[in-house]
Amino acid sequence: MKNKEREIIKIILRAYDHHLIDQAAKKIIDIVTKTGAQIEGPIPLPTKKEVFTVLRSPFVNKDSREQFERRTHKRLIQIVNPNNKTIESLMHINLPSAIDILLKK
């Protein structure tokens, strides 16, 4: 039996707006499928929720507080056996600046 090695590129997208991250994932998937590579995803990863508590008054009244939260949404896209055309098209993709992209091999 032959061991068929699969080369996988993992793309992790992070953003505060889930609509924006879904549009970016769709754009990446469209570009990669045009080059003939296989795709797994977008796989939704757990959303990170951060809560910040601040005092409302500048001096006294510690019982009066306000809470703010920030949610970071994540998506994972795996490109299986990419070719040179796939990598070249990923280098020239335009995505909004609100999206953080992490590439792993």
From Swiss-Prot:
Superkingdom assignment: Bacteria
GO MF, one example: structural constituent of ribosome
SMART domains associated with the record: Ribosomal_S10
One Pfam family named in its UniProt record: Ribosomal_S10
Keyword Nuclease annotated: no
GO biological process, one term: translation
A GO CC term attached to the entry: ribonucleoprotein complex
Xref: PROSITE patterns: RIBOSOMAL_S10
Keywords attached to this entry: Ribonucleoprotein, Ribosomal protein
Subunit and interaction comment: Part of the 30S ribosomal subunit.
PANTHER family for this protein: 30S RIBOSOMAL PROTEIN S10 FAMILY MEMBER
Family (UniProt): Belongs to the universal ribosomal protein uS10 family.
Function: Involved in the binding of tRNA to the ribosomes.
Designated name of the protein: Small ribosomal subunit protein uS10
Species annotation: Phytoplasma australiense
Gene that produces this protein: rpsJ
